Swiss-Prot record:
InterPro entries for this protein: ATP_synth_asu-like_sf (IPR023366), ATP_synth_asu_C (IPR000793), ATP_synth_asu_C_sf (IPR038376), ATP_synth_F1_a_nt-bd_dom (IPR033732), ATP_synth_F1_asu (IPR005294), ATPase_a/bsu_AS (IPR020003), ATPase_F1/V1/A1_a/bsu_N (IPR004100), ATPase_F1/V1/A1_a/bsu_N_sf (IPR036121)
Keyword Ion transport: yes
Reactions mediated catalytically: ATP + H2O + 4 H(+)(in) = ADP + phosphate + 5 H(+)(out)
EC number, UniProt record: 7.1.2.2
Gene Ontology cellular-component terms listed: plasma membrane; proton-transporting ATP synthase complex
Site, as annotated: Required for activity: S450
Biased composition (Acidic residues): 599-611
Protein name: ATP synthase subunit alpha
Annotated segments matching region Disordered: 592-630
HAMAP family: ATP_synth_alpha_bact
Length: 630
């Protein structure tokens, strides 16, 4: 077969035409050194800080890395995975992408690693959206003050150190003092409240993470929880990035108008991992060998927790809004954001339907004519109802992300570098003390130095009305208890304060994995602060509390319903609570024995005052027997 030159040239031309002209240009480099999760790469002169790079191993596998250092002749990158497959001379390719993780409803009930990949053996994540791990925190205008309570189910916290939705509350204490237990109880208590929980385990044992997963599953809490695990066996880069993955997953739910709770257990391990990376990257060390930007490491993470502002629009009646579109505007060309958004939207609506009448209202406001203001507002309100316009709220606004970071201290030293940093960033701290823990006070919360700076605004009025008395009584008890160690004889008032304090301390004790509904907390704390438990022995209070809840649920269920719905303790409700507690106390005393019954009937204060009675009887008996002998 002979081919002519013309045919050959035509074949070549066709082949050239079929070649895709869009050439793909990729910048590649080579590994200079690798070890301890860090690689030095030469040849990526145009790489950007925070960019993902792809390492291609000599054995064919590939790993992702994150550019952290940009130097004159090389780039320092943290490798996400086992570095044993990466060797000197291996190729490294730029991706041009910032690190992203999958987010969405499919993550609920799953255990993922620091890269957002599932590790629970339940198959791949079927998510439609990916989000950047590093984003700016919401600005001032996008936020609103904390006003809704985030009930933890723990009496001592909800009463004296309340947490609100959108708050950042630090849990701090030595190792093995119950920090994780407090966090897990808070997750369990969110069941049925519409709160999505994200638990980030940093540097923990795999067995510990497994226990947490099993406990959440046993209490039906795993269905609304996502576990992000960067365990002790993971490399430092994965432990460093895990909290950012967790908050990114939580932000998805916050930005869809829902409420999320993020727990970082614990940030001390993240700081240690970041210190390791920084030292390997030859960054200058500072205090305790941490790098200079370790404060920013935690501040940019915790600032992403926020209560988002509600957004209102003036629209034509019947208009449906999907929400979440920052560029959307109402018929007045505005989006009314923030604490005064509803007020602003109302004014805009009134101005749209009757500008002349609204001008009169504005003038009346300037002149402070209250009666005229009220009259004009009513007229405009009636016109607004009859108009073709209405005010609607963006359904994806008003969400919240609450952060509960955990910090481990050494021998109770809260003045160390990382604890002081995180204390200054957060809106309060719950301090767990080893001495209290080992003395049987669990949760071992030191109420004296624990504080919530903004949660009080979110606390329900019923709890607020009794919590002030509780904190004061406990403070007096601690002062008196310290004083009584040196005093041999105490007056009746001091003894009564010590007795009251001992009972209040006892009722604040709580078992693990048994969070309490707020109405039950209010009932028992009310009983303690009003002195209704003073006649009961301290040792019986735990059983008394448990049986009191059952009694009220069975005989007086309306009390719990009223507390839950009204959220205020009026005189009638207080009277019914007191009556129910007194009724049950008599029954409890009869079951406990005759001595307690007598104490209830006589209204005796404490056991010490009842003790001399038997001695008096024995003395009279002796004198009577002597008289008979004579």
């Amino acid at each position: 077969m002979q081919l002519r030159a013309e045919e050959i040239s035509q074949i070549i031309k066709k082949q050239i035409q079929n070649i895709d002209k869009a050439a793909q240009v990729t910048e590649t480099g080579t590994v200079l050194t690798v070890g301890d999760g860090i690689a030095r790469v030469h040849g990526l002169s145009r790489a950007m800080a925070g960019e993902l790079v792809e390492f291609t191993g000599s054995e064919g596998g590939s790993l992702m890395g994150l550019v952290l250092n940009l130097e004159q002749d090389n780039v320092g990158a943290a490798i996400f995975g086992d570095t044993s497959s990466i060797k000197e001379g291996d190729a490294v390719k730029r991706t041009g992408r910032i690190m992203e993780v999958p987010v969405g409803e499919a993550t609920l009930g799953r255990v993922v690693n620091a890269l957002g990949m599932p590790i629970d053996g339940k198959g791949p994540l079927e998510t439609k959206e990916r989000r950047r791990v590093e984003v700016k925190a919401p600005g001032i205008i996008q936020r609103q003050p904390v006003t809704e309570p985030m009930q933890t189910g723990i009496k001592a916290i909800d009463a004296m150190i309340p947490v609100g939705r959108g708050q950042r509350e630090l849990i701090i204490g030595d190792r093995q003092t119950g920090k994780t237990a407090v966090a897990v109880d808070a997750i369990i208590n969110q069941k049925g409240k519409g709160v999505i929980c994200v638990y980030v385990a940093i540097g923990q044992k795999l067995s510990t993470v497994r226990q947490v997963v099993d406990k959440l599953d046993a209490h039906g809490a795993l269905e609304y929880t996502i576990i992000v695990a960067a365990t002790a066996s993971e490399t430092a880069p994965l432990q460093f990035i895990a909290p950012y993955t967790g908050v990114t997953i939580g932000e998805y739910f916050r930005d869809s108008g829902r409420h999320a709770l993020c727990i970082y257990d614990d940030l001390s391990k993240q700081a240690v991992a970041y210190r390791q990376l920084s030292l390997l990257l030859r960054r200058p060390p500072g205090r305790e060998a941490y790098p200079g930007d370790v404060f920013y490491l935690h501040s940019r993470l915790l600032e992403r927790a926020a209560k988002m502002a509600d957004v209102f629009y003036v629209v034509s009646k019947g208009t449906k809004i999907e929400g979440g579109d920052a560029s959307y505007r109402g018929i007045d060309g505005k989006a009314h954001v923030g604490a005064h958004g509803m007020h602003s939207a109302k004014d805009s609506l009134w101005k749209t339907i009757d500008g002349a009448l609204f001008e009169k209202l504005e003038q009346a406001r300037k002149d402070e004519k209250k009666d005229e203001i009220k009259k004009l507002e009513q007229q405009l309100s009636d016109k607004a109802k009859a108009s073709d316009y209405e005010i609607v709220r963006d359904p994806k606004s008003g969400g919240s992300l609450t952060a509960l970071p955990v910090i481990e201290t050494q021998a109770g030293d809260v003045s160390a570098y990382i604890p002081t940093n995180v204390i200054s960033i957060t809106d309060g701290q719950i301090f767990l003390e080893a001495d209290l823990f080992y003395s049987g006070v669990r949760p071992a919360i030191n109420v004296g130095i624990s504080v919530s700076r903004v949660g009080g605004n979110a606390q329900i009025k019923a709890m607020k009305s009794i919590a002030g008395t509780l904190r004061l009584d406990l403070a007096q008890y601690r002062a008196m208890a310290a004083f009584s160690q040196f005093a041999s004889d105490l007056d009746a008032k001091t003894r009564a304060q010590l007795e009251r304090g001992a009972r209040l301390t006892e009722i604040l004790k709580q078992g693990q994995y048994v969070p309490l509904a707020v109405e039950k907390q209010i009932l028992i704390i009310y009983a303690g602060t009003q002195g209704l438990l003073d006649s009961l022995p301290v040792s019986s209070l735990s059983r008394f509390e448990e049986e009191l809840y059952k009694f009220v649920e069975a005989k007086h269920p309306q009390i719990f319903t009223d507390i839950r719905e009204k959220k205020v303790l009026d005189d009638d409700l207080k009277s019914r609570m007191t009556k129910a507690i007194d009724t049950f106390k008599k029954r409890f005393a009869v079951e406990a024995g005759g001595a307690s019954t007598a104490a209830d009937e006589d209204g005796a204060g404490d056991d010490e005052e009842e003790a001399p009675a038997p001695k008096a009887k024995s003395k009279n008996a002796k004198s009577a027997s002597k008289a008979k002998e004579k």
